[in-house]
A protein has these predicted regions:
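C-terminal or mid-to-C-terminal helical accessory/interaction module adjacent to the motor/catalytic core
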Residues: 109-167
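Phosphate-handling DNA/RNA-contact segment within nucleic-acid enzymes
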Residues: 1-75, 91-93
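Hydrophobic alpha-helical scaffolding
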Residues: 16, 38, 58, 62, ...
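Conserved phosphate-handling catalytic cores of large alpha/beta enzymes
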Residues: 64, 73-135
Length: 167
């Protein structure tokens, strides 16, 4: 099997690092709800739209950029991240923490904690979309989320200390 998503290369007309994938209702929905939901892939955006969350967008992969955060921050300062429940999603979340203050120290970025058995939003939608509203309520500030994930992954106190010093 090939990759789940095959993204276009950059061209004169398309610059991936400046674009987000979303439906036409995104901007009005973000303004109405007061927050945006960022997910990893196209199918996640479509799944959330089916669940009534048209305030969702995707950077078309895990590489969220400063330019994309700036674009979203024009409409809201509250962002809920829900990247895939895997190592790449976790690394992408760490990167968002690194770049968020370059955009604005007013940005509030929280993370949704997917149940372990689900890889992403589209799996939740396929199996049990009704639980998403509970997942949405149970969000953590990005730094709390990353600390929790790191502590879950290691019992080595030195590694934990070094991680805290890094963030």
């Amino acid at each position: 099997f090939g990759p789940k998503y095959l993204n276009s290369s950059d061209s004169v007309l398309y610059k991936k690092n400046r674009n987000l994938y979303f439906t036409k209702e995104f901007i009005s929905s973000v303004k109405k709800k007061g927050y945006a939901i960022l997910v990893e892939g196209y199918f996640d955006v479509l799944s959330l739209n089916q669940l009534g969350y048209s305030n969702s967008a995707s950077p078309s992969g895990t590489a969220l950029t400063i330019q994309q955060l700036e674009a979203i921050s024009r409409y809201t300062n509250k962002i809920l991240l829900c990247f895939d429940n895997d190592e790449a999603g976790l690394k992408a979340t760490e990167r968002v923490l690194e770049i968020k203050n370059q955009v604005s120290n007013q940005l509030e970025i929280h993370c949704l904690n997917l149940p372990e058995k689900y890889k992403d939003i589209s799996e939740i939608y396929e199996e049990n979309g009704d639980i998403f509203s509970d997942i949405l309520k149970d969000n953590l500030e990005i730094i709390e989320f990353l600390i929790d994930k790191f502590i879950e992954s290691t019992s080595d106190k030195k590694s934990i200390f070094n991680y805290f010093m890094k963030i």
